[in-house]
From Swiss-Prot:
This is Large ribosomal subunit protein bL12. One of its GO terms (cellular component) is cytosolic large ribosomal subunit. GO terms for biological process: translation. CDD domains: Ribosomal_L7_L12. Keywords: Ribonucleoprotein, Ribosomal protein. Homodimer. Part of the ribosomal stalk of the 50S ribosomal subunit. Forms a multimeric L10(L12)X complex, where L10 forms an elongated spine to which 2 to 4 L12 dimers bind in a sequential fashion. Binds GTP-bound translation factors.
């Protein structure tokens, strides 16, 4: 098998859809036993809170999945919203909407997830963020 250069790999990735890239990352992680998640620095507790039990500390979720539960009555508007949020083509976006419940975005920050949820709900879809 020919060895691909970094530039050739980047060009190949540019041609993939968001869902295809997500699947690639999952398989890469499984194959090599690694994770693509950025390391998260744990903030030290203030000295005043030193007596508090560590179980009381609640770690805020950093990555969210936006799940399309139902397209609702305005399916065309939902397909348009999905296309705006992702790099999917018309057929892929339609297949995603028809196959609900399905993830629209995976492992995104809270701000992106909230914006996506608002856009999809504005189009008439039922959406959950996990």
């Amino acid at each position: 098998m020919a060895k691909l250069s970094t530039d050739e790999l980047i060009e190949a990735f540019k041609e993939l859809s968001l869902l295809e890239l997500s699947e690639f990352v999952k398989r890469f992680e499984e194959t090599f036993g690694v994770t693509a998640a950025a390391p998260v620095a744990v903030a030290a507790a203030p000295a005043a809170g030193a007596g508090a039990a560590p179980a009381e500390e609640v770690e805020e979720q950093a990555e969210f999945d936006v799940i399309l539960e139902d397209a609702g009555a305005q399916k065309i508007q939902v397909i348009k919203a999905v296309r705006e949020l992702t790099s999917l083509g018309l057929k892929e976006a339609k297949d995603l909407v028809d196959g609900a419940p399905k993830p629209v975005l995976e492992k995104v920050n809270k701000e992106t997830a909230d914006k996506a949820k608002a856009a999809l709900e504005g189009a008439g879809a039922k959406v959950t963020v996990k």
